[in-house]
UniProtKB/Swiss-Prot annotation:
Pathway(s) where this gene product acts: Cofactor biosynthesis; riboflavin biosynthesis; riboflavin from 2-hydroxy-3-oxobutyl phosphate and 5-amino-6-(D-ribitylamino)uracil: step 2/2
UniProt similarity note: Belongs to the DMRL synthase family.
GO biological process: riboflavin biosynthetic process
SUPFAM superfamilies noted in UniProt: Lumazine synthase (SSF52121)
GN (gene name): ribC
Protein name: Riboflavin synthase
Amino acid sequence: MKIGIADTTFSRINMGKIAIDELRKISSIPYERYTVPGIKDLPIAAKKLLEEKGCDIVITLGWVGGTQKDMLSYIVLSMGLVIVQLMTNKHVIDVTIHEDEAEDEKTLMMVAENRVREHVRNAVDLLVNPKRLQKLAGTGQRQGYPDVGPILK
């Protein structure tokens, strides 16, 4: 069993380092890291990690700028990652931070770190403890921000 971690140089923080730190805290599952320039390179990085490096799941770590072109690049990334999942029949967990999703850099940093750490836990659970995720179904979990909880009847 192995987890792939694909990150970018475009990111404003070292998301790969955070992911590895969290993975080491919660699991002894080995990992393979693959760093690429930007988010549009993440689909091929994920595919290589799955097919060439023998990973069972990949976490992609991307940072999206705040322009309209950046948003279009994110759509391309997202479509590419879905195609990789369908081609390989394996999960690719997309962990993306959007430059404009927080009002200041301190909050953006907090959201980014929390989102990375929470998705690393999700990836580990998908591999070794899927029942944990089933128990959380419908509970309003959020990665990066506080959970919102379920809608009560």
